[in-house]
Regions:
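Conserved beta-loop-beta element that borders a ligand/cofactor-binding pocket
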Residues: 112, 149-172
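Mid/C-terminal beta-alpha module of Rossmann-like enzyme folds, strongest
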Residues: 211-279, 297, 313-351
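Conserved Rossmann-fold NAD(P)-dependent oxidoreductase catalytic core, especially the SDR/UDP-sugar
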Residues: 83, 88-140
Length: 351
């Protein structure tokens, strides 16, 4: 049985492809030319290149494929870029689902986002809470809601599609690295000057991988399943970082309203003068942390047999991975240092 995986070089994809290979699966990965694909270096996978926005490229990628994991997505917490997000995430998913159907592929598991689940103020959100596009939301959140709409349309047309909804991922094989990965590296290297209170749902890399495998094996067609390890406040996360790295958290704990203003100004300046530079703490990210959105994972546990593991273990694994890549100075950390990556790998991954 051949599996196609999109987004194989991302944080989720790099962990999922390794699990599939460990399980003896035949894996083909769809990659974009010119992207940072270091996460697949040295792996025994078939590589095909193409863009989700190009239906012809997808026809070739799906040829002979039995099952599909669609993990690729453009991520952004910036208030802008609506058209590109729509084309990459919504149109890209539509194209992939059609190509999979035309190729006769079986089940497609699509990675969803907890950002596209509605917010309850008085209780954790489950899969039944609808996303309200008229609420204040980032273009990325709206695009991921659009992705789920495309999945439902495909199901109505007879296609076997299941959505595995991801939260913020922590864990190893973070080659790019992710926003949370950069935060951990900054903390470990003593470069984090301040933080803000808040909280969000986090998922260990091994857990979100397990959730995708379970969705493929046991999920019901047309259903989505929220996969999270646990809700964690920023203060709790700082405590975990302290235990793992041996460093103290920053003394400066900024009030969220102050940070929201700073983020607005920073986004305006950076978008104008440094548009290619990644924006870390955006107004959208601050808003999400302030919401304290909690997830109800009962459905995944009941229907799939999903069992979450430890967030602290995930942070340890991510930290050890970064040491192995040479991205942490290692002066104070208590964990064993692995062989450093080459200078070429470091530059490519941090680009």
């Amino acid at each position: 049985m051949k599996f196609l995986l999109t987004g194989g070089s991302g944080h989720l994809g790099a962990n999922l492809v390794r699990r599939l290979l460990d399980d003896g699966k035949d894996v083909r990965v769809l990659l974009r030319e010119g992207s940072n694909n270091a996460g697949l270096d040295g792996l025994d996978v078939e590589r095909v290149f193409g863009d989700l926005r190009n239906p012809e490229a997808l026809k070739a990628a799906l040829r002979g494929v039995d099952r599909v994991y669609h993990c690729a997505a453009k991520l952004s917490t910036v208030d802008g870029g609506e058209q590109e997000l729509f084309e990459c995430n919504v149109i890209g998913t539509r194209n992939l689902l059609r190509a999979a159907r035309d190729a006769g592929a079986g089940r497609v598991v699509v990675t969803g986002s907890f950002s596209a689940v509605g917010h309850r103020h008085d209780a954790p959100s489950d899969e039944t809470v609808p996303f309200n596009p008229f609420d204040k939301a980032m273009p990325y959140e709206k695009s991921k809601a659009g992705v789920e709409h495309e999945c439902l349309k495909a199901v109505v047309e007879g296609q076997d599609v299941v959505v595995a909804t991801s939260c913020a991922i922590l864990g190893p094989n973070d080659f790019k690295p992710s926003r949370m990965g950069r935060t951990l590296a900054d903390f470990a290297n003593g470069k984090m000057r301040a933080y803000i209170p808040g909280g969000f749902e986090f998922v260990a890399a091994r857990d979100i991988v397990s959730g995708h495998l379970l969705a493929m094996e046991k999920g019901r067609t047309g259903q989505k399943y929220i996969i999270s390890s646990r809700f964690t406040t920023v203060d709790e996360l700082m405590e975990i970082f302290e235990r793992v790295t041996g460093r103290r958290r920053p003394r400066l704990r900024l009030p969220p309203p102050v940070m929201a203003v700073i983020a607005e100004v920073t986004q305006a300046v950076q978008s104008t003068f440094f548009p290619s530079r990644p924006q870390r703490l955006t107004p959208g990210a601050v808003r999400i942390l302030r919401m304290h959105r909690r997830a109800d994972t009962t459905k995944a546990k009941t229907e799939l047999g999903y069992q979450p593991t430890s967030i602290e273990d995930a942070v340890k694994e991510q930290y050890e991975f970064f040491i192995g890549q040479g991205w942490i100075d290692g002066k104070s950390p208590p964990l064993a240092r692995k062989a450093p990556a080459t200078e070429e790998t470091k530059k490519r991954a941090l680009a």
